[in-house]
Amino acid sequence: MLKRILVIIGLAVLATACSNAPRTVSHQVISENDDIQLTGLINNLEKDNRTGIFHKVRTNRSSALMGDKALASVYNEWVGTRYRMGGTTKRGIDCSAFMQTTFSEVFGIELPRSTAEQRHLGRKINKSELKKGDLVFFRKNNHVGVYIGNNQFMHASTGQGVTISSLDEKYWARTYTQSRRIM
């Protein structure tokens, strides 16, 4: 009986853990000398209605999206690292640990380890007020990322690992719950 209860609890935790959004982002290394153009990372797939297959679309790199070289450096260092619940290393990391690492390395701010604690930091702000470095929360505050500008955020998702996504994507727009400014 106890074993069955533990299995059910484990499944519930997995179901509410960091998000598993649709795969719409390609991974690429970003030059620290360039402004980062992340809309190209998000919007570089186009569906062929005839075949239903997505293919890459050429995009320009002119949008100054994430000029902060420290954020670019953290992204480049962690991009593609797989998601691992409770993970804190390059072998696997979860969303709250990735925020903890990012804020420590980029802003010198020590965040608590869990999303449950992070969701109470700083002050709540409207989505329209988002600035680079704000925390964005999803799925009843069980998933967290850092806003990087141009309606995009950096996070660790179960499906893609460390990646960049757009708040405009259906999944993220539907599951967005709040934003918080801690700086």
UniProtKB/Swiss-Prot annotation:
Q: Which SUPFAM superfamilies match?
A: Cysteine proteinases
Entry membrane topology: Lipid-anchor
Q: Which domain of life is it from?
A: Bacteria
GO (cellular component) term, any one: plasma membrane
List where in the cell it is found. Cell membrane
Q: Which UniProt keywords apply?
A: Cell membrane, Hydrolase, Lipoprotein, Membrane, Palmitate, Protease, Signal, Thiol protease
What PANTHER family does the annotation carry?
Answer: MUREIN DD-ENDOPEPTIDASE MEPS/MUREIN LD-CARBOXYPEPTIDASE, MUREIN DD-ENDOPEPTIDASE MEPS_MUREIN LD-CARBOXYPEPTIDASE
* Top EC group: hydrolase
Q: What is its main location?
A: membrane
By what name is this protein known?
Probable endopeptidase NlpC homolog
| Sequence ranges assigned to domain NlpC/P60 in this UniProt record | 65-183
